[in-house]
Structures are given as C-alpha cells and as structure tokens.
C-alpha cells in the first residue's frame, strides 16, 4: 500500500508528531479478559489475520476516524476514549494501537479498507452483503472480449459493475453477445484457431482468432459495447440511425435491416429494463438510507444519461454504529471497486472528512467527482425517492424476519464467529465416496436456521483419492460452474478438519470470493478456521447444534446419492437374470439395497425369501458370480 514505515510497539507519538504529509492508520488490538484499553500493547502482535485472542485487531481506521473516536492521542498510561455506544466493549476488549504511516489520506483510506476486509474487526461497520459481486470485464487486448469476473485487477482492462443481481448481469451480457460481434470462444488471452466457430457463421463474431477481423472494425464494435455498458445509449442510437440511413442510401438493404433490428433491440431493452428520468440530468449516483434500531438499509441508484441503470442495496445490523459510520462504510467499500464512476454523487446527509474520499474518486475516475447534499430541486427529490425506497426495503426486511421466525441459534452463531449480521443462508459441504470411488460433493442449504431441501445439490467429482483436492474442486465448481447463480451464503460449513477448510479457502480465493468459512470435525465436534484455530463448545451450545444439523444434512445428501447408485446398479444386474421378474427385483432391492450386500447373501437365505425358489436363487448366485466386482 505504499506505507512508509511502522512505528514501534508501545511508542507514543508526541502531540502533532508524524512525518510531514503522512497519515497514520491505527488498529485497536483485543485485550485479554480484565485488561483495560491502554496506549501501547501488552500482548504479542498477531502473526496473521487470524482471530487470535491474544492479539486480534478489533478496529481499523484512518487518522481522521481515530481522532474522531479518541479526540486526541492520550498520554502514556491514559485510557483511550471509547467510541460512542462502545465504551464497555472497548474497556473489555483492547490493549493498544498500531500505526502504519501512509503518504496521504487516500492511501490511508485504501489501507483502512484492506485491513477491514482482511481482519473483519469487531467494532468496524461490516456490510451484510460484503461479498464479491460480479463485474463485466472488457479485456485489455488488441481484440478484447467481455468476461464475467468477481475480482477487479490492475491489468488495464475496463470493468463495469458491480452487479448485485445476477439476472441483470445475464440480461445485459446476453444482449451484448447477441447484438455486438465480439469474440466469445477463443479464450483469454486470445488463442489462435484453425477454423472459425459457429458464432462467426451466425454473424455474432468477427473471428479475430483466425485472422478474419479488421482491427478498425473490431474497435468500432468495442466502442459501441462501451457505450452500452456506460449507459450512453441515446448517442449510440443516433449513430446507428445515421449508419442505417447511409446503408439504405447505398442500396445495402440487408445491412440497413440488421442495424434497424439492432436499434429496436436496444430500445426495447432500455425502455423495459430502466426507469427514465430527465435526460438533462446526465450521469450521477444518489443514495438513500433508512434505519430501525440495529437494522439499517442503504441503497444506491446509478443514473446514466438520465436512466436508472441499476440499484445496489446493503443491509447492516450493528446497534452501536452511527448513521454516519454506516454510510461511510458503504461509500468506502462500494467506490473502491465500482466502475465507471459518475461525475456527481448525491448523499442523503453531510459527512465529516469527505475530502479523502473525493480525492480517491478523482484518482480512480481520472477527473473530479463531486460529493453533494442537495437541499432543493430535482436532485433533492431524487434523495427523497431513494429514502422512500430504502424505507420500504427496511420494512420488508423487518416483516420477513418477523414472519419467518428466525432460529434462535443464528444470533448465537453471529456472536460466536463475529459475523457482521445474522447468517440467514448457510451452506454445508461434504465429500463422500462409494468404496473409495465415485467421489461426490454434497451441498445442504439452511435458510433461517431450517433446511431448504429444494436447494440441496450434488455433483460428481473428477478428483481421485485426495480428499483435499476433492473439496477444493467441489467448492470451486459451486461458485464458478452451473451453480454460480445461486444466492451466496452468509456462512460456509465444511465437513472436516483444518485441511479440508484450507482447501475450501483456496477454492474461494481462486473464484474471487470472500465468504466466512468454518469446519466441523467429526467425533470431537470441534470448530476449526482456515488459520488453524480450534473452538470447542459444549454440545448444548445452540450454534454448535445448528452446525451439527447442517453437517449431518450435507452428509445424508451424499449418502442418498450413493444408495440411489447402488440400487440402479443392482437393478441393471437383476434385469438380465432368468427367473427374476419385476416382483422379485423389487423384493431384492428393498431387502439388500446394493449389489455388494446381495453378493454376500447365502444361497439358503435367498431361497427362503417370499416369492423366491431354490432354482431362482441358484440362477441369481450364478449371475452375480460372473458380475465384475464393484
């Protein structure tokens, strides 16, 4: 992050001290039971972002934020002033501050965001939907392609998003794939092919992978795609209309008809998918917020060329956080990744120390981004609209919670794991196999603390006898394959120990996701984290009982698959045996379930079964003896 240095532990920066032009980012450290929050730390520094009770970061903040919480740096031995509403928690929970010096407020803001994401400190505002939503990426190549990704990288590509709703992303991606002939099937970076694909034959690709695309014509398509993704549709429609008229003037009627169809598809999409405002309003974002007790909803609307392109909504559940802290956390997390940025952002109420955020937005956008709180006029009415919708979303959330009667263990689970909100959706993962073969990845889903069996899933794995590789493959495919559009869980539970948990963490990292993750080892019923921390709870603990139920459901989901396979295999074998008709097949399936158990059954036992004869039993044993071992 460009940090210039780290001050020694326990040192007290003198009043007004510091390197000129630098900003310090502080990290509160957790205290052992009974210790008070002091300047300087009694415990060892944590070796990693794990939740080590001897040195866990409990809060991260830039210099301005810490000044607001503690007023002035205290003298040696003085207690730090707690944040509003957190005095008792801080008195129980901290031993000191670490400082990292950065070059300016913008670097401090970036570092603060990264520290919060890495450590998820207890006293910072953590957004409920703090996950990597998908972006559309226009690659940085001579012949770019459009990809769906979950991580923004500094690679020169153009990113558009985030898209909180997978349906909206699919619709815009499908529209672009259908109307604009960007390459689609030649990989990233582009690989040369011998023959063009079917998209070229359908007129949906210019086939640069076989050298058929004219670079200038391809860049023209790229420019049009950028216009769609940035919401500049009106200008694009005018340009296409001029091209249509020019094609008709040259008597190129087929080309003119193609452009006409393209224009009609764009008009239909943007008239039904978006609400139109005044086109003179241009590009801007506006926000609304509503709150009831600990629960708050923040919503951001993106307006481009006078149309609402999308809405992003976040739920925060934190009793002690102020409205200003919640809004600041939303702005920080959203604008560190969102792209492209508008020239104007309308805020529902003033915030202190917005200069650093404005400077960060300026650097990201390459131009000034104004942060404004309008008091009257059309823009003030936009804020009223946003607040009204945020209030409706909050009321809906409260009614849903009341109606569904959340499981009491969810609050215990939130407190136990330090989650930002009650984990509504849980997913449990299990690896099972049939006699060392046919490994299966099983998914169980709980919502509100109760099984949602219609969303249980299973998948056959390619990994061999390596349980860790199997877990990594299963988790990666859950978030990148055919199941990627399912809702993201608030917590993952792995059936296994630290090895399986770390394999799952690697898969999440490869998929560009950051999700809370724990494992539950069999037998000892011990919770484990990717960092190797073990948490032993009494069997009567409600959170542990809920996780055991989830783990067992995932395991049973896998067993049901293997039982079904055994029955299918047995049915296949029985079909070809003389004297074994439908009734006898059904009897044997119900009694033995699988081929292995049937092979081990004695001849006399088979002959005594209702409806079986000695001759039929002998024919059955002879046929089973010829069957290859399972």
UniProtKB/Swiss-Prot annotation:
Q: Where is this region: Disordered?
A: 1-96
Q: Name one GO molecular function term.
A: DNA binding
Please give the SUPFAM superfamilies that the UniProt record associates with this protein.
C-terminal UvrC-binding domain of UvrB (SSF46600), GIY-YIG endonuclease (SSF82771), RuvA domain 2-like (SSF47781)
Please tell me whether the keyword tRNA processing is annotated for this protein: no
Domain UVR stretches: 234-269
Write out the biased-composition intervals (Low complexity).
Answer: 9-28
What residues does the GIY-YIG domain cover?
Answer: 52-125
Entry GO CC? cytoplasm; excinuclease repair complex
Key word Cytoplasm present in the record? Answer: yes
Listed GO biological process terms: nucleotide-excision repair; SOS response
Name the family the entry cites: Belongs to the UvrC family.
What NCBIfam families does the record point to? uvrC (TIGR00194)
Could you identify this protein by its name? UvrABC system protein C
Task: Give the organism the record lists.
Answer: Thermus thermophilus (strain ATCC BAA-163 / DSM 7039 / HB27)
User: Which gene codes for it?
Assistant: uvrC
